[in-house]
């Protein structure tokens, strides 16, 4: 049917569509070469394993050679295939990664976006209330809100306003802020209806039009232990929602506010990516987390943030005070934590900001010492529905402006 539709389009429409499609692909890093060949040759390459787009191109990824005699309909069909190609989704991940970094840095920089303190509801907008900061309440006890005016103004509440929320809302906001940074404010305001940007309890989002978990989320990817994602490479992790959760039952929890940590992945270093691929995902690190927890059981905690100071900050004075019988244990813990995954798998978790995942595993030894913790990726649609929506928005932008290769994020 797709072929029939293509063949039925006027030539001028095909040409315009092809120009916009090729322009977007080139903006994402594809290079096209006309050659004396009879059929197109496509080299996508393992783009998600690369540190940067420049590295991918230098390795020969994202290259197309096609005949100059290729018919317009065939050309458009090939371009459409490339838009759906896994290598293109990985190239898009570089744009996504830059957006994640801008979004999470902005959220981290707002000292008035907090977790602790007395809240009147699940999300607290302070004395001025939600409407003054661009949000409208749709559920009682602060459990659900949608943007009241422009989407970008609503997110400004978390960039520069005074808001209190727990880490689950922090993750939702980071995910939505990433879309804002990916589109640019004008397109972000135009693309999404207010209900699509609902925030609140995770359970409540399922009954909304949320693009994260509701009716507009579309096609989810489920890879809890990151088996497939680890095989794809480091860029496949960027922007993904995930969580750290207690392994034993709630009866072992001493600090309920730290029973879990919700986060988005900001960056994955080369060593961390190699380790995840070698070990087949996160299950291996659940075992390492338990080993760390077991070793910690034999060391008495002294003062606040004891393990954080001992193992993350590696405070020399604190280490000097260790009784000789504990030094070998601490050395074993150091060796486990020196794994690149703990050092280079960088996440954003509200209100802790941008830190390596090892920091969080260590701090939870202090907060909830009677249970180990596990790490899982959450359901997500970054590489499916949200990628396709962004792609179509860029193609519409090209058609409206007549500027192939331009993005909605670009200055006018």
Per-segment meaning from a language model:
Residues 198-273:
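...with weaker cross-activation on analogous glycine-rich loops/strands in unrelated enzymes
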Residues 123, 127-130, 135-161:
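Active-site nucleophile-His-acid catalytic modules used for acyl/amide transfer and hydrolysis
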Residues 13-18:
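Boundary at the C-terminal end of the N-terminal hydrophobic targeting segment
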Residues 179-184:
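Low-complexity, highly charged intrinsically disordered N-terminal segments
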Residues 282, 287-412:
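Low-complexity, Gly/Ser/Thr/Pro-rich intrinsically disordered linker/tail segments
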Residues 21-83:
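Cationic-aromatic interfacial patches
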Residues 1-12:
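Bacterial N-terminal signal peptides
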Residues 156-178:
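Active-site nucleophilic cysteine motif
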């Amino acid at each position: 049917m797709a072929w029939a539709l293509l063949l039925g389009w006027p030539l001028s429409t095909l040409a315009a569509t092809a120009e916009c499609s090729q322009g977007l692909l080139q903006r994402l890093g594809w290079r096209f070469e006309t050659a004396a060949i009879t059929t197109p040759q496509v080299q996508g390459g393992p783009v998600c394993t690369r540190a940067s787009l420049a590295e991918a191109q230098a390795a020969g990824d994202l290259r197309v050679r096609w005949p100059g005699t290729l018919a317009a309909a065939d050309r458009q069909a090939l371009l459409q295939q490339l838009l759906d190609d896994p290598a293109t989704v990985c190239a898009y991940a570089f744009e996504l990664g830059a957006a994640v970094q801008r979004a999470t840095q902005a959220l981290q920089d707002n000292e008035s976006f907090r977790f602790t303190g007395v809240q009147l509801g699940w999300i607290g907008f302070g004395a001025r209330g939600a409407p003054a900061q661009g949000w409208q309440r749709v559920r009682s006890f602060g459990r659900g809100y949608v943007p009241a005016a422009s989407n970008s103004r609503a997110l400004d509440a978390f960039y520069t306003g005074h808001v209190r929320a727990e880490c689950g809302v922090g993750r939702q906001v980071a995910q939505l802020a990433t879309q804002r940074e990916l589109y640019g404010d004008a397109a972000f305001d135009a693309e999404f209806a207010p209900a699509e940007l609902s925030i609140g309890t995770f359970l409540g989002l399922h009954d909304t039009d949320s693009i994260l978990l509701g009716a507009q989320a579309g096609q989810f990817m489920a890879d809890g232990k990151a088996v497939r994602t680890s095989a794809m490479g480091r860029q496949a992790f960027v922007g993904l929602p995930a969580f750290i959760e207690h392994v034993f039952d709630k009866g072992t929890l001493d600090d309920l506010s730290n029973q879990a940590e919700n986060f988005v992945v900001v960056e994955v270093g080369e060593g961390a990516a190699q380790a995840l691929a070698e070990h087949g995902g996160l299950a291996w690190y659940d075992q390492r987390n338990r080993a760390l927890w077991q070793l910690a059981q034999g060391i008495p905690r002294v003062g606040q943030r004891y393990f954080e100071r001992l193992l993350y900050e590696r405070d020399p004075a604190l280490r000097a005070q260790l009784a000789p019988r504990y030094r070998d244990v601490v050395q074993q813990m150091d060796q486990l934590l020196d794994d690149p995954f703990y050092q280079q798998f960088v996440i954003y978790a509200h209100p802790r900001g941008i830190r390596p995942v090892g920091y969080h595993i260590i701090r939870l030894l202090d907060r909830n010492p009677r249970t180990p913790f596990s790490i899982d990726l959450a359901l997500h649609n970054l590489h499916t529905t949200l990628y396709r929506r962004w792609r179509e928005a860029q193609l519409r932008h090209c058609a409206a402006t007549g500027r192939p290769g331009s993005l909605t994020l670009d200055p006018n």
